[in-house]
Amino acid sequence: MELTDKVALVTGGSGDIGGAICEALAAAGCDVALTYVGNTAGAERTAAVVTAAGRRAHLIALDQRDEGSIDAAAADVVAAMGGCDILVNNAAWNIGIPFPQLELLDGATWDRVLETNLRGPFLLSRALRDALAAGDGGRIVNIASVGGLSPGSSSIAYSCSKAGLIHLTHCLAVAMAPAVSVNCVAPGLVEGTRMAQRLPDAVAEGARRQAVLGKVGSATDIADATVLLCRADTITGQTIVVDGGMPGAMNFG
């Protein structure tokens, strides 16, 4: 799909990865609406990058746990931007709880992670289905995690939410075909992000050593994979892993 003059909605556009995705889509010719919660300064910085690229930017405050807020955001982007061709479900929430410490993962925390990371993307995809299908080929790209492919992320709740998002990708690819293609990007450790900076040095260095390329991904790498999937006309229901080639996540068929 040619991306010039397409309208993209990126959730969590105020963060490191979301901001990079917005920048890459703007560079590819898209007008970009982005959602944020709390981080107004980050959202405004991203919007400035989009407008500096000569594209329109639109900010939307969104609570991904609230169905009314989700429906309002969907209506907002269509009204303000004249439609929506691309949805990037990037926004997520996490809390670091080691897997064995089940007693620390209470029901409220579990619900917050799953509602933000899985329920929210489903509801927003559903709300924008007609708008995405109205053009010459809509696109949804879900940003998951390698933690959704195998245990090892910062909490069981996060890992399960991202596994669900990967399978939601498969399900929506069937449900929304042929008008909308639905794909997924699963990052590993992403250099330079706030989440990566919170990791112990030994953990980050271990990830770099294990990667067969000798390095892990950056926010720009995640953005590039997202743009690739937006452009692709015959890819749907797929997950691209961006982690430098971690042996445990590789499948050579």
Residue ranges of model-derived segments:
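Short C-terminal tail/terminal secondary-structure segment
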Residues: 94, 99, 150, 236-253
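Alpha-helical segment proximal to the catalytic Tyr-Lys
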Residues: 130, 173-178
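Conserved glycine-rich cofactor-binding loop
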Residues: 14-15
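Substrate-binding pocket helix/loop in short-chain dehydrogenase/reductase
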Residues: 98-114, 196, 207
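Residue(s) in the substrate-gating loop at a strand-loop-helix junction
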Residues: 145
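C-terminal substrate-recognition "lid" of short-chain dehydrogenase/reductases
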Residues: 2, 125, 177, 215-242, ...
